[in-house]
């Protein structure tokens, strides 16, 4: 559903959607290096090399959305009004928007910290815009949960967490 909502918003064809070159994985499918605490998801960029006769052939970015189940479930337990489906939908929409913005060169993956914070606000605003325009059961508490991000930016403890390295891992994938 997240893919459909985001691709409809950005008016992406099925072919364009495939060209985003990404995958979404949950905790069961993540390696140790892909698991983080205090974040609901992270995007890791891998360099995907096509198998060709030329060893120095082209490399294409592959984005892996690493869903952090443990952090999501902790938030669901802590905040009674958060619904798992609506919360997960928000998270995946948010991460897909990041990938689209990376692919359209609207944001650099390796941007400096202050730019990443500004980008988080922009992406939260866009996520709210997309999810506000559809009827989804229990989405309002989720939008309220993230409301601070759409107004003044992240709260200080989130800034500190982001400064410690969120969304900046690069790995090579053969």
PLM regions and their residue ranges:
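A metal-dependent hydrolase signature that marks the N-terminal structural subdomain at the beginning
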Residues: 1-58
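Long, well-structured alpha-helical subdomains associated
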Residues: 132-174
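Conserved binding/catalytic microenvironments
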Residues: 71-76, 118, 139-143
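Post-HEXXH active-site segment of zinc metalloproteases
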Residues: 73-74, 82, 86-90, 101-129
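Active-site scaffold of zinc-dependent metalloenzymes
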Residues: 38-86
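Solvent-exposed amphipathic alpha-helical surface segments
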Residues: 5, 9, 130-137
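Short, charged low-complexity intrinsically disordered segments located at boundaries
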Residues: 29-39, 126-129, 153-163
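A short mid-domain helix/strand-loop element embedded in enzyme catalytic domains
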Residues: 66-69, 95-104
């Amino acid at each position: 559903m997240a893919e459909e909502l985001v691709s409809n918003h950005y008016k992406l064809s099925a072919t364009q959607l495939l060209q985003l070159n990404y995958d979404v994985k949950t905790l069961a499918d993540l390696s140790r290096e892909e698991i983080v605490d205090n974040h609901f998801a992270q995007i890791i960029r891998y360099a995907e090399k096509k198998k060709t006769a030329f060893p120095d052939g082209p490399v294409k970015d592959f984005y892996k959305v690493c869903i952090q189940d443990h952090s999501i479930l902790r938030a669901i337990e802590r905040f009674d009004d958060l619904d798992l489906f609506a919360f997960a939908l928000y998270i995946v929409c948010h991460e897909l928007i990041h990938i689209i913005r990376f692919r359209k060169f609207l944001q650099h993956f390796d941007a400096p910290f202050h730019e990443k914070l500004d980008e988080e606000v922009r992406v939260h605003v866009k996520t709210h815009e997309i999810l506000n325009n559809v009827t989804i059961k229990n989405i309002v508490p989720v939008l309220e949960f993230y409301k601070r991000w759409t107004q003044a930016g992240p709260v200080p403890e989130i800034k500190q967490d982001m400064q410690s390295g969120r969304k900046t891992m690069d790995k090579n994938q053969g």
